[in-house]
Amino acid sequence: GRGHMTTLFASPRLFIATVDFNLEICPILVNAQEVRGCWITLDYCQEGRCEVAMPGESAIIVKPGDCCLSASRRLPSEYRYPLGRYRGIKLCFSDGVTNEPAYGVMREAGFSFGSWIEQLDPAVLFEGDDQLNALMASFEALVDPFDAPRSKLRFMEVLLHVKARGLPTGRRHSYYTKSHMRIARTTHDRLCADLGCDYRLRDIADSFGISVTSLNNYFQGVYGVPVPTYLRERRLQEAAKLLEVTDESVATIAARVGYANPSKFSAA
């Protein structure tokens, strides 16, 4: 895959990144030994979906319009983007950032990350918070060209907004266990390995010992749409690519991507 991440340090303990990736997995290039203390990350998803790792190989799935606040003393080994497409804004800061002179006003206000870190355990999801989304989106205009002073002010606005509204509580609707993630990923890989195969959801669900409804729920949670919708979209994408790069007939390409009847392919 391809893409780019622009990372800029507004201060020693705060960096801002704009992310635009067309890939599913991006390795972390920072040496874990370089990370000191507890680091807090706020991810704002604008397009695609991203995974935020949780204990036990589980994950929170961040979809467009969501912000995920997470804390960790260890960096993950990689970032994962289930749809192979992601665009977003990332703030990463140390729990000691407010000790820097630029953020003295936060200390005067008695701001502390201690209670946040206890509540995160290790992540929470803000869904549909338009004000927070607008604040996060505004960083795009501050990084090109980079405006460090205004970025620091905007960062403090973000912190004060989160402090005022409080961290989300209750059931995590976008939380998926290790088992859920394994089922969704295995199903995805099985489908994409041979788009021409005639798959039956009942057979796939039975192989995991779950219902078709559960299979679709897990898959949709990670990839955004139910299995049939995802498979149809991937088949059409592959067919469009083949039409561009080969001289094969529509009927031949239709069969290669799982449409034995060309008329059904045209209708799709």
Enumerate the predicted regions with their spans.
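Loop-centered beta-sheet repeat module
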Residues: 91, 96-159
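N-terminal regulatory/effector-sensing and dimerization cores
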Residues: 2-111
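Short, Lys/Arg-enriched, Trp-marked, Pro/Gly-tolerant hinge/linker segments that flank
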Residues: 114-128, 144-151, 159-189, 193, ...
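Residue-level recognition of oxygen-bearing side chains
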Residues: 248-249, 264
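Active-site pocket scaffolds in enzymes
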Residues: 243, 252-255
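Long, charge-rich low-complexity segments
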Residues: 88-98, 138-143, 199-214
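Basic/polar phosphate-binding segments, predominantly the helix-turn-helix DNA-binding elements
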Residues: 161-167, 192, 197-234, 254-268
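A short, Lys/Arg-enriched amphipathic alpha-helix from helix-turn-helix/homeodomain DNA-binding modules
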Residues: 128-138, 171-199, 205-207, 232-248
